[in-house]
From Swiss-Prot:
It is found in: Virion. This is Head fiber protein. GO terms for cellular component: virion component. Keywords: Host-virus interaction, Viral attachment to host cell, Virion, Virus entry into host cell. Disulfide bonds: none annotated. Transmembrane segments: none annotated. InterPro entries: Phage_B103_Gp8. GO terms for biological process: symbiont entry into host cell; virion attachment to host cell. It holds the Pfam family Phage_head_fibr. The keyword Secreted does not apply.
Length: 257
């Protein structure tokens, strides 16, 4: 046990929870604030300014006036004017009732030396509100946009995450993600012949198949013949000449032998 002298900061009733106050060269005591962890319990009535001795014992149990009906096993915290009340808030619970009590009666509280600490986003002090909203899982679109600004510095990536990429953004993103020049050319929709060959080799596609020319015995690709205008012949000889020109074009294209 350790004892020291303190002064009552206000009128204090016995069996109420107390807190420590410092004053010039003295220690003062008063009722503990609601929903805080108390430091002492009063065992006698005091008037404001009274000098008293505080005896500190190992924490075991306190007898305190109940603010409300309390059941054995209820977790308790500081109520109004230093009384004790039930609580489910583990951050403010300082013990648990080991006896029944009606409001205004004495209840025995076992002092818990282990406190469960729960930290919420609002407890994080100097933290951006958008980060707190994210941690609470209730971020708005505006919060999300600000978070992306916090997390991402690359403007093209930001544009992608914001769903507003321009063509320049897309090209820059492809340059960020892909190092192979042949694939980049393909993604940029401008591969030259050599690049096309490289890409086919990369995916195991080989050389494109070319249809053979059609013959009388072999099926092949259909070729286009040069355009021919309508014949303007007014006599048989000219008409035959135009027809022979058409036949020649068809032979060249492989339609006929």
């Amino acid at each position: 046990m350790y004892s020291f002298t303190a002064y009552a900061n206000s009128d204090i009733v016995a069996f109420h929870l107390l807190k420590f106050l410092s004053s010039e060269n003295n220690i003062e005591i008063s009722y503990a604030d609601e929903d805080t962890i108390p430091e002492y319990v009063s065992i006698r009535d005091l008037k404001a300014g009274d000098k008293t001795t505080i005896d500190l014992y190992p924490l075991v149990a306190w007898k305190v006036i109940a603010q409300e009906d309390i059941t054995t096993g209820d977790r308790v915290s500081v109520g109004k004017n230093g009384q004790v009340k039930k609580t489910t808030d583990l951050r403010t619970a300082f013990g648990y009732a080991v006896s029944l009590a009606k409001a205004g009666q004495l209840v025995t509280v076992a002092i818990s030396t282990v406190f469960d600490t729960i930290i919420t986003p609002d407890d994080l002090g100097n933290v951006d509100d958008d980060v707190k909203a994210f941690l609470k899982s209730n971020a708005t679109d505006a919060n999300k946009a600000k978070l992306r600004d916090l997390l991402v510095s690359n403007l093209d990536v930001k544009a992608f995450l914001n769903g507003s990429t321009s063509e320049d953004n897309k090209i820059n993103l492809r340059n960020l993600l892909v190092s192979n020049p042949a694939i980049l050319a393909f993604l940029n929709a401008n591969p030259d012949t050599d690049t096309q060959t490289t890409l086919r080799t990369m995916i195991g596609a080989g050389t494109p198949y070319t249809l053979p020319a059609a013959t009388t015995t072999t099926l092949g690709g259909v070729k286009r013949i040069p355009a021919f205008g309508n014949s303007t012949a007014t006599d048989v000889a000219t008409l035959v000449k135009d027809f022979n020109n058409l036949l020649a074009a068809m032979r060249t294209a492989g339609y006929i032998l």
